[in-house]
Amino acid sequence: MKIITTVQEMQQITNELHASGKSIGFVPTMGYLHEGHATLLRKAREENEIVVLSVFVNPLQFGPNEDLDRYPRDIDRDENVAKENGVDYLFYPSVEEMYPAEQTTTVEVVKRTDVLCGKQRPGHFAGVATVLMKLFNITLPTRAYFGMKDAQQVAVIEGFVTDFNIPVTIVPVDIVREEDGLAKSSRNVYLSLEEREEAPHLYGSLCIAKERIEAGERNPEIIMNLVKEHIEKYTKGTVDYADLYAYPSLKAINKIEGRIILAIAVKFENVRLIDNITLMGK
């Protein structure tokens, strides 16, 4: 595995790989890698001749009161995870390398961002789309891999890749969970012991909702209230949102039918966790 820290060197390598016809699997991350990221890397390894991993904590996607400075970082750990999962190139640029001058152009996402995390974090997805446009141009991937824990992000990325005719296939990968159901996340380290015991109820509430939908419930409001009540009963967290939309359009629905997403965000004392399930409403 080779570690690359400059845009120029990374572009030179991927241009040569692209010219030789080799397939490139790309996994963009903000580091502090866990089993969820490892799953993305293994899938990329299975499906491509070359695997490129990026580790970059992107300041553009953090708001003024968010956890940019507190976001966990451990490049030694990330290097080990990368090596163990078959990464060929680890792209690890600095903020100054990625943004050497004041940004004069950003990618403004106008659909799929006014709900869920997009509603709570204005400007977040513009930051995500902007850095991905740069990373796609730098790494020239055949396929790019994203976890469905950030399902809204996947929907936004699929939309902007289509809109800009970017020649990359977006590969969504199922959420990886702890044994008790908690979605793996770099931010889980901020949970207190008590909160860690409560946190699996996020997924538990989604499972209860799924059972009700499969039993025939078609009223979104009833399902959302069921989720909120479960979380409020079994955790001390505050429900940021518990919403149900068509997926991937993220349009509001009056009746549960077709492919839908049920997504939640819960604020604990020092961390905000998200989770979701997608399913087909009959």
Swiss-Prot record:
Pathway involvement of the protein, from the record? Cofactor biosynthesis; (R)-pantothenate biosynthesis; (R)-pantothenate from (R)-pantoate and beta-alanine: step 1/1
Q: Name one GO molecular function term.
A: ATP binding
Q: Quick one: a GO biological-process term for this protein?
A: pantothenate biosynthetic process
**InterPro entries, alphabetically?**
Cyt_trans-like (IPR004821), Pantoate_ligase (IPR003721), Pantoate_ligase_C (IPR042176), Rossmann-like_a/b/a_fold (IPR014729)
**Residues the record marks as active site:** H37
User: What keywords appear on the UniProt entry?
Assistant: ATP-binding, Cytoplasm, Ligase, Nucleotide-binding, Pantothenate biosynthesis
As recorded in UniProt, its EC number(s) are: 6.3.2.1
Q: Does the keyword Glycosyltransferase apply?
A: no
Other remarks on record? Answer: The reaction proceeds by a bi uni uni bi ping pong mechanism.
As for family, the record states:
Belongs to the pantothenate synthetase family.
NCBIfam families given for it?
cyt_tran_rel, panC
What name does this protein carry? Pantothenate synthetase
In its UniProt entry, the species of origin is given as Bacillus mycoides (strain KBAB4)
